[in-house]
Amino acid sequence: MRAIIATMCALGLTTAAVGAVPSHFQPRAQELLADSIQLEPTANHLNVIYFVGNDREPLADYERRISELLIYVQQFYGKEMARNGLGNRSFGLVLKENGNVNIILIRGEKPHTHYAYGTGHNDCLREVNAYLDKHPELRTSQHNFVIMPTHYDEKYNDLNPGGVPFYGLGTNCFALDYGHFDIRHLGQRTHEGRLLTKWFGGFAHELGHGLNLPHNDGTASQNAQMGTPLMEAGNYTFGYSPTYMTLASCRILANSEVFAPAGCTTRFYTNTTPPAVYASNFKRVGDTLEVYLELESNVVNVNAYVQDPPFQVNQDYDAVAFPCVMSRTHEGKTGAFAHIPLAELAELKKVYDGTIALDILIQTNEGSRFRWRVPFNLSQVPADGTIDMGTPTLHYGY
């Protein structure tokens, strides 16, 4: 790490989390970033990559535009971490001397049409990793944020961007760039403003996936007070109407590689062996569900999510999140307790209609995540009844 930092300094780069808003940022960016908070320095940083096919060039002024947008998102994450009591922490960014984000430009081996939405990520990631292997001083974490210009053809253009990968895959995520992808349109009641909310909201949302976040919703009372969670439908509200991050999301981020504080030497995501579950209890107490787990001592965070069907990928936006209260038992095990008032599930449509699920996300001290799904039928559980959790079956990742 010291060698990488020394190389970065020689290249005129800095790992500072935030400083004064760069003077060359446009007035709208200056305005939106005027209330920036001082973020804690991080040990690791997001690899930001601008990837173009061999028949395309980057879009005009992409470095300034993407920098303004990314720093705004970094601030949003940091302010939400602080609001949730986890400190002024956000994902680290490597900055150039002029304050722009260090965006790594990679030119693909094939034409831009090869890197299309459905499967284009495969060769893109192969080429990205090959490039970073040749330039290890540029790889500052395992998290890659890949941005591609929209396809310009008979279907896609600046008024209807698309055609490129736009999703999260493990520690990688993809977003797009287009001519009007500019923070000056944020919150504007114009076509460009509405378009920016969609694609900039998606930019922030897919980045969340690349930083280990699953879809999740807030409770009924939280949503009434704060708006829409970013990892629910916040990609359609970001910058336009109140959008927030749940405590469950922020607790996952607190144990993610690019949020690790300066000086941290943890090797992240190395443990793929599920932690032991020593005890589990799931019961209904009147109008509340209660979950208690005793787990291996390396567990540092547990979230409980209640979801109605369907349970397939991208059908979990409405999974209501309940972060567990964490404790340490006399035997040195990790205790986790979730209190789930049924009234807070009011936005779920099928709570009492057949099988729903309790999803448990378990996070270890080096950031690895494991999921355990417990299907149950609430309508068949008496007011003070116990729900069978079955044999613990933990799956790595999410």
Task: Specify the residue positions occupied by each region the protein language model found.
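Positively charged n-region of N-terminal signal peptides that target proteins for export
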Residues: M1-I4
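Propeptide-to-catalytic entry region of secreted or membrane-anchored zinc metalloproteases
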Residues: V21-N144, M148-P165, Q312, A321-K333, ...
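Active-site recognition of the HExxH zinc-binding catalytic motif
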Residues: T197-H215
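Bacterial N-terminal signal peptides
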Residues: A6-T15
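Compositionally biased low-complexity segments at domain edges in trafficked proteins
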Residues: D388-Y398
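A structural motif
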Residues: D158-H185
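Short pre-active-site segment immediately N-terminal to the catalytic Zn-binding motif
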Residues: H180-F203
